[in-house]
UniProtKB/Swiss-Prot annotation:
Pathway: Secondary metabolite biosynthesis. Its cofactor is Fe(2+). It comes from the Eukaryota. Keywords: Dioxygenase, Iron, Metal-binding, Oxidoreductase. Fe cation binds at residues 227, 229, 287. One of its GO terms (molecular function) is dioxygenase activity. This is 2-oxoglutarate-Fe(II) type oxidoreductase ppzD.
């Protein structure tokens, strides 16, 4: 994971186009078109770290239903959300986290060995914590017996559990297909990466960034500090409010916005584990959530849904020999995916 220079963390440039790919070319296209898609996908992820995909198999109505349910959940009284509360400590990483409970800024330079708590300018409207300005709900696979899910009461929000478990499985299918496409793009067996993720340990998250009035802001306010994701591939669904920015790979420390032309588009980004496996052939790109410059947007709530793909817990996440060229050295030592995730996770709570 690369460092973000303190002098340039607030540098911003106009929107640069993150390419949008048609996933139907991979799933339903001719073999030549499918392989071409895979190579283009790897090219996008290697150069930018992010890509948008459409025609991925999850319908617009399914996505809309999750956003509606997310708004209903976060509008519940605090006591109702608290019935599914995330514990004060990192584990189990399940349930509802209140505004400021998670502190992602603590791990933004983890691979550089910088693990101290960093101070960032944030929204003084919420004095709980200076690092994070969101509330969230996390769940894992229904079959994950190590970390069972924490659900709100059915009478408080009918249908929540069924809808969320179903959507999790839909995202899991897309995650597996993206891993296959990346493997093919590297001229490897389609199952090369999915075999490393056969235990379903991925997580689905609902995010709510409460509305903010301009009078409550100070210079440099952020909703979420710079960070990279822990796992393999992240699938992000976001509303029209905006605020997601990613680091320019050619100018470290400079960020540009990523907008969704359609709510049904999935924004895909690489996580740390694939960066480690590929020996930096693909980087996990630093990203953050800032407040939109549009004055009207400042008063709006922002919602997003993220699926964090992860390897099997026992799988090692050091550099794989398939990605270490002759004359190169492995950049990452072996460590289990579970231990790597835990070392970073415990810093965020």
């Amino acid at each position: 994971m690369r460092s973000v220079s303190p002098q340039s963390t607030m540098a911003r440039i106009p929107e640069r186009r993150v390419r949008t790919l048609d996933f139907a070319q991979f799933r339903h296209g001719e073999p030549s078109g499918s392989r071409g898609f895979c190579r283009e996908l790897v090219d996008c992820l290697s150069s930018v770290g992010f890509v948008k995909i459409r025609n991925h198999g999850i319908s617009g109505q399914e996505i809309e239903n999750v956003f509606v349910m997310s708004q209903l959940f976060f509008s519940l009284p605090q006591a109702a959300k608290g019935k599914a509360a995330h514990p004060p400590e990192a584990n189990p990483h399940r349930g509802y986290s209140y505004v400021g409970q998670e502190k992602l800024s603590r791990v933004k330079d983890y691979e550089k060995g910088k693990r101290e708590i960093t101070d960032v300018y944030d929204i003084k409207h919420y004095p709980i914590d200076r690092d994070a300005r969101q509330e969230s709900y996390d769940q894992g696979a229904a079959v994950d017996n190590l970390y069972p899910n924490r659900w709100p009461d059915e009478q408080d929000i009918p249908g929540f559990r069924v809808l969320m478990e179903t959507f999790y499985e839909r995202c899991h299918e897309v995650h597996q297909d993206i891993l296959r496409a990346i493997a093919i793009g590297f001229d490897l067996s389609p199952s090369f990466l999915t075999d490393l993720c056969c235990q379903n340990t991925s997580e689905l998250r609902l995010n709510h960034y409460p509305s903010v009035h301009p009078s409550s802001l100070r210079k440099g306010a952020k909703r979420i500090s710079e960070h990279t994701d822990f796992g393999t591939v992240t699938l992000l669904f976001q509303d029209s409010v905006g605020g997601l920015e990613i680091e320019d790979q050619n100018t470290p420390g400079t960020y540009f916005p990523v907008l969704s032309e359609r709510k049904s588009d999935i924004i895909v980004n690489i996580g740390d584990c694939i960066q480690r496996w590929t020996n930096d052939k693909i980087h996990s790109t630093s990203h953050r959530v800032v407040l939109p410059e549009d004055t009207d947007a400042l008063t709006k709530d922002r919602y997003s849904v993220a699926y964090f793909g992860k390897p099997s817990r026992s799988q090692l996440v050091g550099s794989l020999r398939e990605f270490v060229k002759e004359g190169e050295k492995p950049k990452y030592n072996d460590i289990s995916a579970w231990q790597y995730n835990q070392e970073k996770l415990v810093l965020t709570y």
